[in-house]
């Protein structure tokens, strides 16, 4: 890899499972406990925003109990090494956790959103939040009630 200057790596559930993050599709995974259409679709959010907020509150709470593993840290070190010699590493992840960032990676793209981010369904403003949310919360930008949803 000494001649490679710009690398893109795709990661998925396996990298964070080692840290103790529940996967969605494995036996006993989250989709066995919560039907995807109820907690991870616009229709599910419209039908029962409280259920969706509670699901993501549970996921954020679980995230507070885990740490990045050796793979997250190794990718962050690779990124730093490439950057030092004028290169770059982009991590594209299917994961909604922030373990790549906690491990030190900076150039991370989350394909399916991120647990620690909210999106206002009215004005489109995004912001970081590690706290529990509810359907009664207001957007920090437009102040509209019931605006924030998981990103």
Where are these regions (language model features)?
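Conserved catalytic core of sirtuin-type NAD+-dependent deacylases
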Residues: 1-151
